[in-house]
Amino acid sequence: MKMTVDFEECLKDSPRFRAALEEVEGDVAELELKLDKLVKLCIAMIDTGKAFCVANKQFMNGIRDLAQYSSNDAVVETSLTKFSDSLQEMINFHTILFDQTQRSIKAQLQNFVKEDLRKFKDAKKQFEKVSEEKENALVKNAQVQRNKQHEVEEATNILTATRKCFRHIALDYVLQINVLQSKRRSEILKSMLSFMYAHLAFFHQGYDLFSELGPYMKDLGAQLDRLVVDAAKEKREMEQKHSTIQQKDFSSDDSKLEYNVDAANGIVMEGYLFKRASNAFKTWNRRWFSIQNNQLVYQKKFKDNPTVVVEDLRLCTVKHCEDIERRFCFEVVSPTKSCMLQADSEKLRQAWIKAVQTSIATAYREKGDESEKLDKKSSPSTGSLDSGNESKEKLLKGESALQRVQCIPGNASCCDCGLADPRWASINLGITLCIECSGIHRSLGVHFSKVRSLTLDTWEPELLKLMCELGNDVINRVYEANVEKMGIKKPQPGQRQEKEAYIRAKYVERKFVDKYSISLSPPEQQKKFVSKSSEEKRLSISKFGPGDQVRASAQSSVRSNDSGIQQSSDDGRESLPSTVSANSLYEPEGERQDSSMFLDSKHLNPGLQLYRASYEKNLPKMAEALAHGADVNWANSEENKATPLIQAVLGGSLVTCEFLLQNGANVNQRDVQGRGPLHHATVLGHTGQVCLFLKRGANQHATDEEGKDPLSIAVEAANADIVTLLRLARMNEEMRESEGLYGQPGDETYQDIFRDFSQMASNNPEKLNRFQQDSQKF
């Protein structure tokens, strides 16, 4: 090892030694600056490299997304996937290179600066200190007078000790300098050599990777050449076709006038028509119309679900309209509404009218089940019947209201005469009927029975689930409880007079209902059969403020679902397994224990039985209470004059509310606090119930004793869904008032949004649970 500073000169402490030290110290200082700069540049390079890797990964993800987008093109998908995988390997190689760079350059050089240079600086400080002490000792020794022997000896001793210490520290300092000068060469070369080997490994790995990819790239290049040739050929063909088409006469749309009743895809005719809106402005909008499956439907965009104009063409007529200013207009009239349409020309108008008339005639000739009809709210796109959507395919394959209702026990035959395959229903009773019995039910009046067709009418989701929750077996156990005891035989199909007498005795006179005695007045019964804890729990609902009540409902987790579909307590039947309500499945233990205090329903007043059963979501018991004469609007004076409908809201069941409303419940009847069902549903965050009550005419302007209407409660609770529904209903109400007595029932936007909320509340209630889930977080 070549010495930078000589040890002999060190002992002499000569000017040559001091000059050598000064030179070495300056060199070390400059070395430290260079190394610090190199380390900082290395760190910046590594950070930039990591950022490059991150950006490169994002670029690779973009290539993969493009490959997935090109899934229909095997060549593009395969090549992009293969290239992205190879480039991902290169990113991994880059990551390894940066890690090795960090270890070889940054870590090693930083360690050299922090360890070796620090030792040098420490030795320098000690040397400078002892040098200063030596100089002081020499000066003091020179200044001592001869006649002061004691001071002479003391100065001599200090000088001797200081010189010895100086020589020792100076030798250590010189050794540290020489070692540092030697080590810096090895450290710098070692780190740079490691760095170069890292690059060698990086490029070698990249070479191996692309050597394997090379043959595929050559094949792809040859294939690309063929694709370019094919593309040029296709371009020439399209240019020729374009030139040929340009020579045709497009002055008329005769090519679009054809319709085919026997079309393979079921579409008789389709094309653009102008449709007059039902809003206040009576605007005309251009929509894509089609006639298919004996229905007239339209849509705005291809991805939109078609809106059904006419459910069944057999129930409508079509006629020319010459009494309005716009040309080429015709009107499609059904029993419930009419639709004004406008074609682009007289030929197109005649073609559409003829297509509708032909479809009507064809519909009358056809036989069989109508299960392939489009559903008004979730029918598949007219142009995408093969889109692969399972739920839409199910509807096309026959999962209709008829099938879903008839699969309930007892519903496969008429509830009153036993005739098979009934296609009518009484929606407030929850039973299926044959066509003859349905006519008799109509004659009873809607206060006894509301009749609807299972095949021709539109079924709202909550009403369909109500039908699935009851059924002929459940209702007959109530209304035919004493038929066998009384020795009465049910009428047979075809016996019109016997049927009429039997049905009137069954539902109007209720002769066959099992009568039970009522020995207690309603207040006495409540005091006897309702525990104090139960009353406190029930009444505590009304003591909360809007915010507290929402949090309480979220904590109890008993009302976290608005669907209202629950298991019947009689037979445990789950009406619609895909949308079982969490209300009936997760009821708190305390409330179940209190509900057991109600004991046998035979000991309850019918009104109180209906009241309790509404909270328990027990539809069979509710039907039994109504059969025994319960007032559907009975108010419980012991519990704030709450009604069965309010109890159904507190119980969290949408179907229970629907059942009470179908049987005449007053949607605006309020308790002593001035809160109606809409208030309670808003406070609890039950979006599905709010939607149902607004559709049934609930007064959202009514205020409670605190002066709050449902909208202000929803705004305070920050429930966006309910605020949207209330404001939309209020806007629709104002629009109807502005149109006067003969205005339309509401614009299409209002109807579409409420239809969507009804669908979600019944079929996807978890989508409306956002408010409860957010409340649980707090």
From Swiss-Prot:
Against SMART domains, the record matches this protein to: ANK, ArfGap, PH
Q: What influences the activity of this protein, per its activity regulation comment?
A: GAP activity stimulated by phosphatidylinositol 4,5-bisphosphate (PIP2) and phosphatidic acid.
InterPro entries in the cross-refs: ACAP1/2/3-like, AH/BAR_dom_sf, Ankyrin_rpt, Ankyrin_rpt-contain_sf, ARFGAP/RecO, ArfGAP_dom, ArfGAP_dom_sf, BAR_dom
Where are the Phosphoserine residues found in this chain? 384, 387, 521, 581, 584, 775
PH domain segment(s): 266-361
Write the record's keywords in alphabetical order, separated by commas: ANK repeat, Cell membrane, Coiled coil, Endosome, GTPase activation, Membrane, Metal-binding, Phosphoprotein, Repeat, Zinc, Zinc-finger
Q: What is its main location?
A: membrane
Please list the GO terms describing molecular function: GTPase activator activity; zinc ion binding
Output the Pfam families linked to this UniProt entry.
Ank_2, ArfGap, BAR_3, PH
Where is each BAR domain found? 1-226
Q: What is known of its domains?
A: The ANK domains are required for interaction with RAB35.
Q: What is this protein called?
A: Arf-GAP with coiled-coil, ANK repeat and PH domain-containing protein 2
Q: Which organism is it from?
A: Homo sapiens
